């Protein structure tokens, strides 16, 4: 019985199976209560994202957690078991730390997973399925993830196209927060770009999209202005940065349109990042003096360099996770020793109280005080050395020199 981590992720299971074992936000509260009750662990946390579902329990058997997962989702053992991974004790703690630091993510070092783990922990506390051990484990994990972020370069370099596009803009403009940005498209990539821009303090964004309703929906979240593709020529002269990602088969921004905008800008430089395939911006735009055009290929080379940098940082991060997981288990073991010491002291005090009470009664009945005290001392000594004497005798008879040596050290028999 120990800390247990059971899970599947993007490396072990298909999207189809990951969907089947996922826990929706509306169900995860009751699911954690059910898991804690069914496995009799009392402590349970479920992490469920698009790329992974993981179950963490304390004081339970891994087989019981697997059985609960299969029963909850009505899946056969044959379907689930080949895709599962499981960790126990220190390895379970280390795995949680690796996951939270982004070391086990699809994109190495991505920061979003830490927020998702924190949300899962909060929900578990709300469900009442977290006690002292797992509370300490998760709080330590959050500190370790922060330590890894600050002491390594795991998250310093961009490894997504969206993040790389914004990072490039930050290198070109000394103060990106004061720039005006035109985003062309309203898909997932542009939405991620908008989020990175907002995180970097950009407040003036315009989103151009073929379907205005989709652009408007996105703009609500980021406080941006929505326009149609036909309105781009009117807004382009104001844009310091243009980032485009649509599914258009033909270019949306031509050389003539950009050249006209640059004239209206009185040749203030404009950064254009085309992350669409096929291209949204005509290649000839790069020939314009004040236009700086970068394509997805330019970004990809940056991403490849940065990924190599992250892999180096990950080696440092792994050592931190290993060390911190060991330290956490040291704390767990110290709790076990505290319980043992408390139990030993309680038992010894009970023996003492019983013998003292007998001695007091004998003295009250007129017994010889010297004889009563001597009898008390002898009986107390015999009671306290009984268990160690039995252990020493058993070790000696069995020829267990290792245990015999440990017992002698424990009893202080080898001290000068």
From Swiss-Prot:
Biological-process GO terms, alphabetical: protoporphyrinogen IX biosynthetic process from glutamate
Secretion signal span: none
Transmembrane portions of the chain: none
Residues that hold substrate according to the record: 49-52, 105, 110-112, 116
Molecular function via GO: glutamyl-tRNA reductase activity; NADP binding
EC number(s) given by UniProt: 1.2.1.70
Pathway: Porphyrin-containing compound metabolism; protoporphyrin-IX biosynthesis; 5-aminolevulinate from L-glutamyl-tRNA(Glu): step 1/2
Binding site for NADP(+): 185-190
Active site: 50
Keywords, sorted A to Z: NADP, Oxidoreductase, Porphyrin biosynthesis
Pfam families tied to this protein: GlutR_dimer, GlutR_N, Shikimate_DH
Keyword NADP attributed: yes
Record site: Important for activity: 95
UniProt key word Oxidoreductase: yes
Known partners and oligomeric status: Homodimer.
UniProt domain comment: Possesses an unusual extended V-shaped dimeric structure with each monomer consisting of three distinct domains arranged along a curved 'spinal' alpha-helix. The N-terminal catalytic domain specifically recognizes the glutamate moiety of the substrate. The second domain is the NADPH-binding domain, and the third C-terminal domain is responsible for dimerization.
Protein name per the record: Glutamyl-tRNA reductase
Gene: hemA
């Amino acid at each position: 019985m120990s800390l247990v981590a059971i899970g599947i992720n993007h490396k072990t299971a298909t999207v189809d199976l990951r969907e089947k074992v996922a826990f929706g936000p509306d169900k995860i509260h009751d699911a954690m209560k059910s898991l804690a009750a069914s496995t009799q662990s009392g402590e349970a946390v479920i992490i469920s994202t698009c790329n992974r579902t993981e179950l963490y329990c304390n004081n339970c058997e891994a087989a019981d957690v697997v059985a609960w997962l299969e029963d909850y989702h009505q899946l056969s053992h044959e379907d689930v078991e080949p895709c599962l991974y499981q960790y126990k004790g220190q390895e379970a703690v280390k795995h949680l730390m690796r996951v939270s630091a982004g070391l086990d993510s699809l994109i190495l070092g991505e920061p979003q997973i830490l927020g998702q783990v924190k949300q899962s922990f909060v929900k578990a506390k709300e469900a009442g399925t977290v006690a002292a051990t797992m509370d300490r484990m998760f709080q330590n994990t959050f500190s370790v993830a922060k330590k890894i972020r600050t002491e390594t370069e795991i998250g310093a370099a961009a490894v997504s196209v969206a993040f790389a596009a914004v990072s490039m803009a930050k290198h070109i403009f000394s103060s990106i927060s004061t720039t005006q940005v035109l985003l062309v498209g309203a898909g997932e990539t542009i939405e991620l770009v908008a989020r990175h821009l907002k995180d970097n303090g950009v407040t003036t964004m315009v989103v151009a999209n073929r379907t205005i309703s989709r652009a408007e929906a996105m703009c609500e979240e980021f406080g941006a202005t929505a326009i149609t593709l036909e309105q781009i020529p009117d807004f382009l002269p104001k844009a310091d940065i243009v980032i485009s990602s649509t599914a258009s088969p033909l270019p949306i921004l031509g050389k003539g349109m950009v050249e006209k905008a640059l004239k209206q800008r009185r040749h203030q430089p404009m950064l254009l990042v085309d992350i669409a395939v096929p291209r949204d911006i005509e290649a000839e735009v790069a020939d314009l003096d004040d236009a700086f055009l970068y394509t997805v290929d330019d970004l990809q080379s940056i991403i490849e360099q940065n990924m190599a940098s992250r892999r180096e940082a990950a080696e440092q991060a792994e050592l931190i996770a290993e060390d911190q997981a060991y330290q956490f288990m040291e704390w767990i073991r110290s709790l076990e020793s505290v319980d043992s010491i408390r139990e030993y002291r309680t038992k010894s005090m009970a023996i003492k109280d019983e013998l003292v009470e007998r001695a007091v009664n004998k003295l009250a009945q007129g017994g010889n005080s010297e004889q009563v005290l001597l009898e008390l001392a002898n009986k107390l000594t015999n009671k306290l050395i009984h268990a160690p004497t039995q252990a020493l005798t058993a070790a000696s008879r069995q020829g267990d020199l290792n245990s015999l040596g440990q017992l002698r050290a424990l009893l202080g028999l080898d001290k000068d």
